[in-house]
A protein has these predicted regions:
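Conserved acidic
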Residues: 1-139
Length: 139
């Protein structure tokens, strides 16, 4: 059998936060002009390709903290997020009242990964306050 990590290898609350950070897949296609040939890449195969390089969560110590943990491998946080008004396009997604995924400017509360927080900081597109967070830190 395969000895793979599962959701049961992390604290239940951390797994719940991770779940709330998921389900925001952003896929778009644009065409300007005419193309004789177009390609549709196999996204289904891309997920296992990425998953094979993920860190085994059984090798992490999980801590709960509202302070950003720069040394964490994974982080899942509930945040108050502000995306600045001048930002035209960004990947920080939330759902509107009808359940549609949107990438708004302004302030909203959302569950974000450490990677999303790092993106906000790197590109200076906004700011955030971590209300609650779960962090996986290498042992």
């Amino acid at each position: 059998y395969l000895d793979l990590p599962s959701v049961f290898d992390m604290p239940k609350e951390a797994a719940e936060f991770a779940y709330k950070c998921s389900g925001k897949l952003w896929i778009e296609a644009f065409q300007v002009g005419y193309f004789e040939e177009a390609h549709d890449y196999d996204l289904v195969s891309s997920f296992p390709s990425i998953a094979r390089n993920l860190i085994d969560i059984r090798q992490l110590e999980w801590i709960q903290s509202s302070k950003y943990q720069s040394n964490a491998v994974y982080g899942y946080c509930k945040c108050d997020v502000t995306i600045y008004d001048f930002v035209m396009v960004h990947p920080i997604l939330t759902r509107d009242e009808q359940g549609n995924l949107i990438a708004p400017v302004g302030t909203f509360t959302e569950f974000l990964t450490k990677g999303e927080l790092d993106f906000i900081d790197k590109w200076k597109i906004g700011e955030y306050k971590i209300l609650e967070g779960w962090w996986g830190i290498a042992k």
